[in-house]
Swiss-Prot record:
This protein's UniProt keywords: Aromatic hydrocarbons catabolism, Signal, Transport
Pfam family, one: OprD
This protein's encoding gene: nicP
Protein name in the entry: Porin-like protein NicP
Source organism of this protein record: Pseudomonas putida (strain ATCC 47054 / DSM 6125 / CFBP 8728 / NCIMB 11950 / KT2440)
Stated family: Belongs to the outer membrane porin (Opr) (TC 1.B.25) family.
């Protein structure tokens, strides 16, 4: 292994670093209880093995397997707020990843940065901070952020999560109503030590990376969610813009209805997107509808989902993230132009059988009617099996083990067989 290098400090870390002193000064004029006693910090150790075999390869790539093993550490530290009308605090995020096993012919798994030589980096790291302000039930954060929004979903799918540099405002001044707004200026990808401009990722069967060369340093959003009916029903409206590339609207509806020993639920949404501003990436047209119905009783939860993509293009999002649509899976997205897909899924919590900590997920999604541009209709399908266990007691209490097996098949894209093994353990620092 190469010698360890110091962590990269993002611009937000330098910005918020200067603000930490300001927060402490503000705190000095108030009671120490809020800023210090409200502080929390956790350190998660994450061991990740990722293996993906490619068969019936379609496209320019000739790589038949991706396989890497890595160790990561995720530090999340958060202060409380200073006392008074305006509360001030600081959040700090530290990320560190090490290569345990990799080879040039099996690299590019998303766990580790790829070097020009084709090898994966021995280690990488990031350190960032955000200053936060709070008045009543309104909070503003500026700096290094991990947003989890329907228009920019938090995608912690590999060794380390991605982060964004910018500002987020959230207000809960009125019962049931959450108002959100923000702007991000750059991102640090999940397998990178550096920050960069943001790019759009579109599901295009012919050229999946056709928008990746177009970047923007402005992602703007506003949104409103309203929960009512004892929080069993919620509706949402969001607007997002990756400046000069695309703009997108999102409408959501969620409901849960108790019915005897059952709880029935629905999660539905509609996206509508088009080109934005100077259209540096050209014209764009997409709308997407999804619905996921659930029925829960005892340890069982059953799901049935339907998803439909319309417009001239596939679904679009900021890369490299996922999205909240019901049939989007970590391997296939089922969001190509014209695609219609159906899902059946079963989750089980084994606590119902006296085995607390053990859970399973089995799901199957099938898609058709893909406009491939190759002279035939595209079809794809995927089966995922997840088993997870969290040790409940003893010296290893809290240790999480997750196993995932995936089989994905298509007549217009590369077939995939995938296995993941993830061990995680979170330590409460203070």
């Amino acid at each position: 292994m190469q010698g360890f290098t110091a962590p990269r400090f993002s611009s937000s870390a330098r910005l918020a670093g200067g603000c930490i002193a300001a927060a402490l000064c503000a705190e000095a004029t108030a009671e120490e209880a809020g800023f210090i006693e409200g502080a929390r910090a956790t350190l998660q150790a994450r061991n990740y093995f990722f293996s993906r075999d490619y068969a019936d390869i379609k496209g320019a790539s000739t790589q038949s397997r991706t396989q890497e093993w890595a160790q990561g550490f995720i530090l999340n530290a958060s202060s409380g707020y200073t006392q008074g009308t305006l509360g001030v605090g600081v959040d700090v995020t530290g990320l560190l990843g090490f290569k345990l096993d990799s080879s040039p012919e099996h690299a590019r798994s998303g766990l580790l940065p790829s070097l020009d030589s084709g090898k994966s980096a021995d280690e990488y790291s990031r350190l960032g901070a955000a200053i936060k302000f709070k008045v009543s039930q309104t909070e503003l954060k500026v700096g290094e952020l991990m947003p989890n929004l329907p228009v920019l979903l938090f995608s912690d799918l590999r060794l380390l999560p991605p982060t964004y540099q910018g500002a987020m405002l959230e207000s809960r001044e009125f019962a049931g109503l959450t108002l959100s707004a923000g702007q991000f200026r750059s991102t640090s990808l999940r397998d990178s030590s550096n920050s960069q401009k943001m790019y759009a990722l579109v599901n295009d069967p012919i050229n999946p990376a056709r928008l990746a060369r177009f970047t923007s340093d402005r992602f703007n959003y506003v949104g409103a969610d309203y929960a009512f009916n004892d929080n069993r029903t919620s509706v949402g409206v969001w607007q997002a813009q990756l400046e000069d590339i695309y703009q997108q609207r999102f409408y959501s509806f969620k409901h849960a209805e108790p019915l005897g020993s059952w709880t029935l639920g629905v999660n539905a949404g509609y996206f509508d997107a088009r080109e934005d501003g100077s259209k540096v990436a050209g014209d764009y047209d997409n709308h997407a509808l999804f619905s996921l119905f659930s029925a829960k009783t005892g340890g069982h939860t059953f799901y049935v989902g339907y998803q439909q993509i319309g417009g001239d293009d596939g679904f679009i999002q900021v890369g490299a993230n996922t999205n909240p649509m019901g049939n989007t899976l970590p391997t296939y997205e089922f969001s190509a132009p014209g695609e219609r897909s159906w899902q059946v899924r079963h989750d089980y919590n084994f606590v119902a059988l006296g085995l607390p900590g053990l859970t399973s997920t089995l799901r199957y999604v099938k898609g058709r009617d893909v406009e491939t541009g190759l002279g035939f209709e595209g079809r794809d399908r995927e089966r995922d099996l997840d088993l997870a266990y969290v040790v409940q007691s003893g010296p290893l209490a809290g240790l999480g083990i997750r196993v995932r097996n995936v089989m994905a098949r298509s007549n217009y894209r590369t077939d995939i067989d995938e296995n993941r093994l993830i061990l995680s353990y979170t330590i409460k620092v203070f």
